[in-house]
């Protein structure tokens, strides 16, 4: 089993010479459309550290975009995967089923919000889960249209690109896109507050604004679903004002519109709850999950009320690899680890550690326009000094400097001015503090 010392160590520049040679091979074999944030080639990873081919150890504050939530190569996952691979690796569940798939769906039906009878279906990726949630919603309502939100990200397939708000790099040049997609304004407290202070704090008011746009653009009679990330991911870790999600859900319930929660990035303890919609006390009709579900193995799911999930005809849902038994074994071990090791509570601790530090930084630096997020999903919105104008150039400089110092951080946001922190929940306090020290020092240097 992988054992990686939980400390940062730089023995070469980042990236090192071996990584640079491998990057040449990458560029000769992989199309340029597959962009790479930091070309250090990984050999081992565990806890909060990634080790590269040059022997450097980097602090991981990205978790592979919120995937290795319980830490890379988590012991229970390694044991479960080894055992499953030794038994069988694939049969195709829709041809000859197996217990592992059923066990995962049982667990999802148990842990997702809501106490009624539920059903779950498994896929390979978040985008595939989102696509299928729309299929289910359309099948149940017999209506075509879907509403997504400003700043949304839902994937890179044709339909999910249509749902995604940001053009470059996700959509530019790839159209035409799926029809019957409409867009509504999100509750974005930081930027809403620049225009209307009430919008920043009153989620019901922000919800009414969104509903007004929805009713004018498409109307309930043709609307199958509203899909929303309870906390936006790629859009900038935007946490809507309290009451926004509940207002939307109430409108959906009154109008036979499915409320779909895209919890691909927020699910599985990432935000200090098993699912982010729990913070708002809402129960979606359908919930999409992926990323943190299986500690790095490809798995995704759609879970929802049984009557809704049973709407598609027999063989209307499925796929060759969806619910692969090895990925299912990893998912079962992941859920056990979250629940047995107190990782929901750990995410809450990480939130306090990060936000306390970042809020102190904000007090001393007016380029930090906003600090937001929940759990181990925290963002810093960088702006030009004395303004609220996004500063993507500073954001890129900070990220590049962090990488060179051995700290993996990610950027995001419609304007490219968000530093996002997504550490694994198993990172030590000391390692997290070191990463934040480095981030603080870099901001001071610029």
UniProtKB/Swiss-Prot annotation:
It holds the Pfam family Aminotran_3. GO terms for molecular function: (S)-3-amino-2-methylpropionate transaminase activity; 4-aminobutyrate:2-oxoglutarate transaminase activity; identical protein binding; pyridoxal phosphate binding. It catalyses: 4-aminobutanoate + 2-oxoglutarate = succinate semialdehyde + L-glutamate; (S)-3-amino-2-methylpropanoate + 2-oxoglutarate = 2-methyl-3-oxopropanoate + L-glutamate. InterPro entries: 4NH2But_aminotransferase_bac, Aminotrans_3, Aminotrans_3_PPA_site, Class-III_PLP-dep_AT, PyrdxlP-dep_Trfase, PyrdxlP-dep_Trfase_major, PyrdxlP-dep_Trfase_small. It comes from Mycobacterium leprae (strain TN). CDD domains: OAT_like (cd00610). The modification N6-(pyridoxal phosphate)lysine is found at residue 291. The gene is gabT. The keyword Transferase applies. SUPFAM superfamilies: PLP-dependent transferases (SSF53383). GO terms for biological process: gamma-aminobutyric acid catabolic process. Coiled coil: none annotated. Pathway: Amino-acid degradation; 4-aminobutanoate degradation. This is 4-aminobutyrate aminotransferase.
């Amino acid at each position: 089993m992988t054992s990686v010392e939980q400390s940062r160590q730089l023995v070469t520049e980042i990236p090192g010479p071996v990584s640079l040679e491998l990057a040449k091979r990458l560029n000769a074999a992989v199309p340029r459309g597959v962009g790479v944030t930091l070309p250090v080639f990984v050999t081992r990873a565990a806890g909060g550290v990634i080790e590269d081919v040059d022997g450097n150890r980097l602090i991981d504050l990205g978790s592979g975009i919120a995937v290795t939530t319980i830490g890379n190569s988590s012991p229970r996952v390694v044991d479960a995967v080894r055992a499953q691979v030794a038994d069988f690796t694939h049969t195709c569940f829709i041809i000859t089923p197996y217990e592992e798939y059923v066990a995962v769906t049982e667990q999802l039906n148990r842990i997702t919000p809501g106490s009624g009878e539920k059903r779950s279906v498994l896929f390979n990726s978040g985008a595939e889960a989102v696509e299928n949630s729309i299929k289910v919603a359309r099948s149940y309502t017999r209506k075509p249209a879907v509403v997504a939100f400003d700043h949304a990200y839902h994937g890179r397939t044709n339909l999910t690109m249509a749902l995604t708000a940001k053009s470059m790099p996700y959509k530019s040049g790839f159209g035409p896109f799926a029809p019957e997609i409409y867009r509504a304004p999100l509750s974005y407290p930081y930027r809403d507050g620049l225009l209307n202070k009430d919008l920043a704090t009153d989620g019901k008011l922000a919800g009414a604004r969104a509903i007004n746009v929805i009713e004018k653009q498409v109307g309930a009679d043709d609307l199958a679903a509203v899909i929303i990330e309870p906390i936006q991911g790629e859009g900038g870790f935007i946490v809507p004002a309290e009451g926004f999600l509940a207002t939307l859900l109430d409108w959906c319930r009154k109008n036979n519109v499915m409320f779909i929660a895209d919890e691909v990035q927020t699910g599985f303890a990432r935000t200090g709850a098993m699912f982010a919609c729990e913070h708002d006390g809402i129960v979606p009709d359908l919930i999409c999950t992926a990323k943190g579900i299986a500690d790095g193995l490809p798995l995704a799911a759609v879970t929802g009320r049984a009557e809704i999930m049973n709407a598609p005809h027999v063989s209307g849902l499925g796929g060759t690899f969806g619910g692969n038994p090895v990925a299912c074994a990893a998912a079962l071990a992941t859920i056990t680890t979250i629940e047995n090791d107190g990782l929901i509570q750990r995410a809450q601790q990480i939130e306090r550690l990060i936000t306390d530090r970042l809020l102190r930084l904000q007090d001393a630096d007016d380029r930090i326009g906003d600090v937001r997020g929940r759990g181990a999903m925290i963002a810093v919105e960088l702006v030009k000094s004395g303004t609220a104008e996004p500063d993507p150039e500073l954001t890129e400089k900070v990220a590049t400097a962090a990488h060179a110092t051995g700290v993996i951080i990610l950027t995001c946001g419609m304007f490219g001015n968000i530093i996002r922190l997504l550490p694994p929940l198993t990172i030590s306090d000391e390692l997290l503090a070191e990463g934040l020290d480095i981030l603080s020092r870099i901001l001071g240097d610029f």
